[in-house]
């Protein structure tokens, strides 16, 4: 309700979040005012471990997964249907063909890609053109102050093709709020304290904590919170169209919304560039193993 009252009209979920529970909750929350919301969900990640054919981007699974999402969301159409992750084991034209059928059937209005490399975005665009399928309208990359790798190829590709960019994890799973101190235990109840697997593999680094503390001190000196600073940095990039915010509390939500009015200066930009080199992560090895690089090994044959 707070989001709606603030004018937010774009809501993002996925079939794999909490085994489908996120879609059910989202559907219930917006059902009374479905037409005022731009509803996005995703396909590609596994919904349940140990079961066959419940993930990936095969034609069979994409069609089944879409029907499952529609049922959980309680709607007859999905406004934006993301390919949640690349699936090198499935021919791209098979996936795109399935998406085209969903669009023609009226079950999906538009589609997008998430966690795709720049060269794969180009392949998606070419495949859509060849197969006569509407091209993707948005890309959802993992992009924030601590991970600037999308600036190398992903964002330029989106800019070139006119694809919107909806960045996720804008505060790096909480690290950019400044809540984690170098050499100190993680705050009780935080992701760090829970030893969140994905966070332990990427953001949970002493170097990242130190950078976050420097940015927090600078932000507060200029009348902003660390969260407002992190979001203002994203908004200052003209290629970024939208930001996926995931606050857990109303207080965190207010911090996000006030970031819309936060100013950005050349001094801010210079400080960020001095701490995290453009196009690079904050520290060597900072990459999500869930989405590996393929430069030293072949992708699966298609």
Where are these regions (language model features)?
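N-terminal binding-site loop/beta-alpha segment at the start of enzyme catalytic domains
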Residues: 1-41
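A short, structured active-site edge motif that brings together acidic residues
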Residues: 36-48, 140-141
């Amino acid at each position: 309700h707070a989001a709606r009252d603030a004018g937010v009209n774009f809501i993002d979920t996925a079939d794999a979040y909490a085994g489908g529970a996120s879609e059910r909750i989202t559907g219930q929350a917006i059902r009374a005012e479905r037409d005022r919301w731009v509803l996005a969900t995703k396909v590609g990640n596994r919904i349940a471990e140990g079961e066959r054919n419940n993930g990936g981007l095969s034609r069979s699974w994409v069609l089944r997964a879409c029907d499952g999402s529609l049922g959980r969301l309680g709607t007859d159409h999905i406004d934006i249907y993301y390919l949640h992750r690349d699936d090198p084991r499935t021919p791209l034209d098979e996936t795109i063909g399935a998406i085209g059928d969903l669009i023609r059937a009226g079950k999906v209005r538009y589609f997008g890609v998430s966690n795709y490399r720049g060269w794969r975005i180009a392949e998606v665009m070419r495949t859509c053109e060849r197969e006569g399928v509407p091209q993707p309208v948005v890309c959802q990359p993992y992009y924030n102050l601590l991970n600037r790798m999308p600036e190398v190829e992903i964002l330029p590709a989106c800019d070139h093709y006119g694809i919107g960019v909806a960045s996720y994890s804008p505060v790096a799973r909480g690290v950019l709020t400044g809540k984690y101190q170098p050499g100190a235990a993680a705050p009780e109840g935080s992701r760090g304290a829970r030893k969140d697997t994905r966070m332990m593999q990427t953001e949970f680094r002493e170097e990242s904590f130190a950078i976050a503390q420097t940015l927090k001190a600078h932000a507060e000196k200029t009348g902003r919170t660390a969260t407002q600073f992190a979001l203002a940095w994203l908004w200052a990039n003209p290629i970024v169209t939208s930001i996926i915010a995931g606050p857990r509390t109303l207080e965190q939500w207010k911090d996000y919304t006030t970031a819309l009015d936060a100013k950005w200066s050349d001094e801010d930009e210079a400080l960020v560039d001095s701490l995290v080199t453009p196009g690079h992560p904050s520290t060597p090895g900072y990459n999500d193993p869930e989405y590996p690089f393929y430069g030293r090994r072949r992708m699966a044959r298609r």
